[in-house]
């Protein structure tokens, strides 16, 4: 996998700026046809995408097929459908509101749902008439190269989509600070998001940040614990817990604490854990040693805190 540098970002931005004038003026109907073809191509290569991401991220193949390959194609189809009714011009009183493409969009995406996150950014930008410079996660980049092949095969004009692989401190930083980029869309940690926002501020870019967090699962006293506790465990363990909305903190009434622990422990014991390429598995490996160490630290912290 190429380890990009700032000069690679310069070339990608130059290509995106060159392509922007023509792409932004391309009729909506033509842009929509490209999105439809992209959706069809994503579906045609869904098995390959699912296997690739199962290998990169560790999500079991059954879930990878449904989520990691299914969501990107579905989202691309949604963007294509939106162009049927989206109003790029709207009359309000005696004023005309015109919605124009913002320009060159820098997209920096995470590793947990890699292609899904890429399509959420790239699909919308293409539909709006923007050109893109994408930096996928360096931990799970292969799916982005499949998308680049698909984009090439459907004939998207040169320079409309540009892929620069590499790490965040080098490629991500170059994208967020580049004067030729008009907007940055970032999904990842709060720490990195602060750096992206600070870098983008110098050139007054538009910035969209989706940052990490924790999700409380509140179970009330009158709930059916036998039904909801296992579902909470499932929601916590999906994608090995590597989900921004994973229900990692189950809060139950103190009077039913022991009951909840017993049901949760039984649900965990019944969770199939093995090679993610095997059918029927629910829990695969974590994506990296660093992530494994982080999870172990949280487990130990929980034990230490009682």
Feature map (PLM): residue ranges:
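N-terminal glycine-rich, Lys/His-bearing helix-loop that initiates the first secondary-structure elements
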Residues: 1
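Glycine-rich phosphate-binding segment of PLP-dependent enzymes
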Residues: 10-25, 48-59, 82-83
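Rossmann-like NAD(P) dinucleotide-binding subdomain of oxidoreductase/dehydrogenase enzymes
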Residues: 88-227
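ALDH superfamily catalytic-core signature
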Residues: 191-306
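Residue-level signal for inorganic ion chemistry
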Residues: 31, 53, 76, 129, ...
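Long amphipathic alpha-helix in the N-terminal Rossmann-like dinucleotide-binding domain
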Residues: 14, 36-47, 61-86
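Short linear capping/connector segments at secondary-structure termini
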Residues: 52-60, 90-94, 212, 278-284
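Generic non-transmembrane alpha-helical segments
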Residues: 37-48, 146, 150-156, 229-230, ...
């Amino acid at each position: 996998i190429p380890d990009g540098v700032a000069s690679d970002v310069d070339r990608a931005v130059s290509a995106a700026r060159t392509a922007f004038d023509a792409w932004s003026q391309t009729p909506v109907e033509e842009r929509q046809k490209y999105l439809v073809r992209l959706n069809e191509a994503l579906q045609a290569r869904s098995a390959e995408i699912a296997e690739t991401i199962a290998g990169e991220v560790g999500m079991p193949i059954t879930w990878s097929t449904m989520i990691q390959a299914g969501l990107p194609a579905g989202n691309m189809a949604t963007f294509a459908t939106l162009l049927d009714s989206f109003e790029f011009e709207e009359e309000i009183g005696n004023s005309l509101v015109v919605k124009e493409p913002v320009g060159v969009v820098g997209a920096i995406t995470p590793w947990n749902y890699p292609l899904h996150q890429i399509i959420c950014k790239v699909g919308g930008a293409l539909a709006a008439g923007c050109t893109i410079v994408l930096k996928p996660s360096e931990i799970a980049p292969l799916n982005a190269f499949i998308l680049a092949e698909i984009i090439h095969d459907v004939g998207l004009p040169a320079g409309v989509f540009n892929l620069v692989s590499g790490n965040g401190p080098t490629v991500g930083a170059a994208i967020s600070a580049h004067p030729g980029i008009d907007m940055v869309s970032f999904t990842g940690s709060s720490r990195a998001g602060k750096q992206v926002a600070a870098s983008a501020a110098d050139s007054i870019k538009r910035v969209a940040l989706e940052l990490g967090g924790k999700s409380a699962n509140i179970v009330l006293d009158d709930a059916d614990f036998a039904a909801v506790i296992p579902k909470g465990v499932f929601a916590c363990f999906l994608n090995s817990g590597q989900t921004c909305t994973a229900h990692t903190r189950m809060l139950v009434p103190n009077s039913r604490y022991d009951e909840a622990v017993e049901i949760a422990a039984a649900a965990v014991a019944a969770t199939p854990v093995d090679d993610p390429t095997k059918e029927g598995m629910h829990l695969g490996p974590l994506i990296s040693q660093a992530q494994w160490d982080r999870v172990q630290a949280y487990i130990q912290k929980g034990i230490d805190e009682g």
